[in-house]
Amino acid sequence: MKQTLQLIKYLFPFIILAAFFCLYKKEYSFMKRFCWRMTMTFSARKLFIIVVLSSLIFMNWCCYMTDPNWAVAFAAFMTCCLLFNRVADHVLHRLHERKRFWALTLMLALVCYSIPYMNSIFHVLYMLGVASVFYPSEKVLRMKDDTDSIDNPLGLLQKILKNYF
């Protein structure tokens, strides 16, 4: 069991990276619906946060079962702070809008990945960095309230897709 959890722990970032490159800025109908729902409904954004947090909780559990240490406790604390929807929403918006914070988060994640006992902190920072790319910015969320676009939903969808990433 321990070997399986270690395999999951080390393959997880590569699976997320492959999914990221397969979906980022693609014109699939799935991505159009995803961007539309993430922009238009709060419940879709909340579901997205729940999926990200459940994967983080699973990865924290995998890290705890394979090699428990203080870094796992700190990663679990960071994940618990993100359980508040307002905090997670704020963090994902800031990382999406401010590219320096996003780059700093991913650089810090790489540093944590290179240190063996800080692998659990890497998972938290890495997931936040990848998830923030697919989270809508404040600019896109303001577009949905534009009175000119309400009459033309297809035009609004094209505008959202153009400015989403």
Residue ranges and their predicted role:
Residues 9, 13, 97-149:
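Alpha-helical membrane-associated segments of multi-pass integral membrane proteins
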Residues 32-69:
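Membrane-helix boundary elements
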Residues 1-9, 57-75, 91-96, 111-127:
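Membrane-helix interface and helix-disruption motif detector
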Residues 69-93, 136-146:
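Hydrophobic alpha-helical transmembrane segments and immediately flanking/interface helices
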Residues 6-31:
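N-terminal signal-anchor/start-transfer transmembrane helix
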Residues 50-60, 79-82, 102-114:
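Hydrophobic, membrane-inserted alpha-helices
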Residues 23-34, 83-92:
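C-terminal ends of transmembrane helices
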Residues 140-165:
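Short, highly charged, low-complexity non-transmembrane loops/tails of multi-pass membrane proteins
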